[in-house]
Amino acid sequence: MSDYNYKPTLWTRADALKVHEDDPTTTQPVIDIAFPVMSEEVFIWDTMPLRDFDGEIISVNGWCIIFTLTADRNTDNPQFQDENGNYDITRDWEDRHGRARICYWYSRTGKDWIFGGRVMAEGVAPTTREWAGTPILLNDRGDIDLYYTCVTPGATIAKVRGKIVTSDQSVSLEGFQQVTSLFSADGTIYQTEEQNAFWNFRDPSPFIDRNDGKLYMLFEGNVAGPRGSHEITQAEMGNVPPGYEDVGGAKYQAGCVGLAVAKDLSGSEWQILPPLITAVGVNDQTERPHFVFQDGKYYLFTISHKYTFADNLTGPDGVYGFVSDKLTGPYTPMNSSGLVLGNPSSQPFQTYSHYVMPNGLVTSFIDSVPWKGKDYRIGGTEAPTVKILLKGDRSFIVDSFDYGYIPAMKDITLK
């Protein structure tokens, strides 16, 4: 389709050494153990607000809509009971990924979400797992393209089209009956399952670049090559101080933020392009990448875990970001290190899967909050929304809001 000549920006080990856990300007407030839950029937985690190709969060006829990864809470299933017959919520929560389904919720207020049900009926998806992506409102007729990840067998970026229908009382979805596969990892630019059984290839986030009018997509990947074959050169190291040259097993970390371009705005045919960001020797996961376009800059956000950092590096679960004046870079790590918003060390697993919206609001879900010493409370529900301020290559957390507060930025009246 097109020729692109750019080199990925390297997130270096020297950059990651600058991560400062518990910096008050980049740390999410502590969540109270008495948090409310959206539903006693289902867990939710990755949250995908309905948006347009510019990234603006959309309501339809006054209804806010979010999509979530969802799994039933199996409170009465013997498989998730302990030896005394009590419900083991931890076992149920940790099992959720294998039975993930995409569901939707709606609200008049941007909170107090009402459960709408599954987006795709049972049997529509070609794989056993429905993993995260992006719902895009295409027009004022209510057409939606849900870009998502088909997982097990394999991992394929796909989309499915449907329509939103509203009344004064509720929101329903129609269609979503034919899944179209778009592309998978190629083994040349992006690592495949054959190269690494622990490979990552998921989380499509399409957008139209205002500078050239083309449709692109971010996604999570790993740099191609057999697992453990990546070399940590001086370029990946960066300017590390004396005593920090030991990389341990960092050759196993090869995360990247991938890019693809569509043949046209229909989004039916795609060309895989080189990554925008690589994290070889730094981190193995760069999940749910997405853009915020502000002040003529490209703010690229991704989420990652403490446990996926390479040896002799660390950082909290949370949001990491990079900024550039051009789509293809080069990118500068936000706040020198990349860390934009992390969990406090006192509650390292309280939230995850953050999504930064163009209005600065950041949504996430509650994973687990410490309770009574070594015990903890499982969430599976929306976390409090926070707000960050972006100023050049720096960010600051400036406000916090109610649980699951995801207001629309623009309302579309259907014709």
From Swiss-Prot:
Enzyme class (EC, first level): transferase
Entry's EC annotation: 2.4.1.10
Main function: Catalyzes the synthesis of levan, a fructose polymer, by transferring the fructosyl moiety from sucrose to a growing acceptor molecule.
UniProt-recorded Gene Ontology molecular function terms: levansucrase activity
Record's protein name: Levansucrase
Active site as annotated: 46 (nucleophile), 287 (proton donor/acceptor)
Superkingdom in the source lineage: Bacteria
Organism per entry: Erwinia amylovora
Coiled coil: none
InterPro entries registered for this protein in UniProt: Glyco_hydro_68, Glyco_hydro_beta-prop_sf
GO biological process, one term: carbohydrate utilization
Ligand binding (sucrose): 45-46, 132, 202-203
Record bears the keyword Nucleus: no
CC per GO annotation: extracellular region
Alphabetical keyword list: Carbohydrate metabolism, Glycosyltransferase, Secreted, Transferase
Main location: secreted
Keyword flag Signal: no
